[in-house]
């Protein structure tokens, strides 16, 4: 198979981008797709999900329950659920705030 070669007036071979009638593209949008606050919350809750249940387990098994791993494990599982529920609640509130902001902008346009 052959490809079409574009030869300019000066005799040099051109690419499709060189002869594009639309011209060079404008500046691109390089803003992140996800806001930094969302990433910060996710990283914070990830850290809490890792450290809080493990820390709770070892603290309670050694100092509170006197070696009873069953109670310490149950409390660690409860703490993991607390972190998860807190993250879900915060995500819902953040989403509701964005929806309220979009509604305010829609009212301004009317």
Curated annotation (Swiss-Prot):
Cell location: Endoplasmic reticulum membrane; Endoplasmic reticulum-Golgi intermediate compartment membrane; Cytoplasmic vesicle, COPII-coated vesicle membrane
Membrane-crossing residue ranges in chain numbering: 45-65, 72-92
Cytoplasmic topological domain: 1-44, 93-110
Keywords carried by this UniProt record: Cytoplasmic vesicle, Endoplasmic reticulum, Membrane, Transmembrane, Transmembrane helix
UniProt key word Phosphoprotein: no
Bilayer topology term: Multi-pass membrane protein
Protein family according to the UniProt entry: Belongs to the VMA21 family.
Protein name, as recorded: Vacuolar ATPase assembly integral membrane protein VMA21
Gene: VMA21
């Amino acid at each position: 198979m052959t490809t079409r070669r574009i030869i300019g007036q000066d005799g040099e071979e051109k690419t499709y981008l060189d002869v594009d009638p639309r011209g060079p593209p404008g500046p691109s949008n390089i803003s992140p797709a996800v806001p930094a606050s969302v990433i910060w919350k996710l990283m914070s809750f990830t850290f809490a999900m890792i450290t809080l249940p493990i820390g709770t387990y070892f603290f309670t098994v050694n100092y509170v329950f006197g070696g009873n791993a069953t109670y310490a494990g149950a409390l660690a599982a409860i703490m993991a659920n607390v972190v998860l529920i807190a993250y879900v609640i915060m995500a819902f509130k953040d989403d509701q705030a964005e929806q309220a902001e979009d509604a305010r902008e829609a009212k301004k346009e009317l």
